[in-house]
UniProtKB/Swiss-Prot annotation:
Pfam families: Vps26 (PF03643). Its main location: other. It is found in: Endosome. This is Vacuolar protein sorting-associated protein 26C.
Amino acid sequence: MNNVLDLKLKKIDKIYRPGSKVSGNVVINSKDDMSHSGVTIVVEGTVQLQLSSKSVGLFEAFYNSLKPITLMHYTISVTNGGGKFQAGITELPFEFTLEPLPNQQLYDTYHGVFVNIQYSIKCDVKRGILSKDLSKTIEFIVEVPSQNKEVLMKSTPESLITFNITPDSLVNFKKISKADVPTFKISGGLVSAICNINEAFQGHMIIESADTVIKSVELQLVRVETCGCADGYAREVTEIQNIQIADGDIWRNFKIPLYMVFPRLFTCISTAGKTFKIEFEVNLVIMLEDGHLITENFPIKLIR
């Protein structure tokens, strides 16, 4: 059996908030006595930005603003210098406070396409010249509470949204000639455009009338990632998930519930930094049998 290095956090879900204590153990499992030159832990939080292939080369001014942003970085010495671990399992405790670097702030953990916010703990066990160093890295999750005023906004009547979709209300219809557009009327409502990320997106829709057969109804969650600076920016919209709400020709005047859970890691609270921004939108997509596609867009704000 080779020497095995592992990192174990005391919280099983590995979810922490700014200012909280992060504690755990460095676990070393060795077959024989093992000499070392020291055990260190490096805690790091970074924002990684990148441009899409269509934007590369168009925005030379972006490259300086696209450098990784270090939110937190500190090194912890787990042992006082070198020594020897006895054969078997050795556990070394560690603890640190989750705090950002000066003039920085912590953001939600987020795995996007052009923006990534990650927090990691890396442990290194230094050994002699003739022995191989041991290294182990794990990721932990940071959840940042929203400001109180944002939470209060969620319960105000102004946050309720009603909508009516007709051929005249559509901005971008999939066919140029409106004479070819079938007659339809779709109404509904959303509980709120300000959504708690730990709760489901909810609402309803009603097909009041439609001259053509409806094929299906889908609810699409998209991310809107913006990277750049004052000299210019690149805005990229990509799909996170697509949920089918109804299949086939729906009864007219039947109330259809809209319900969607926000996936962890692939969503975060709506976030804005100096050189990046993360926003979210929901698309209600109605596919007609004749090939038309009706889409209504709802920008939403995610809070915690």
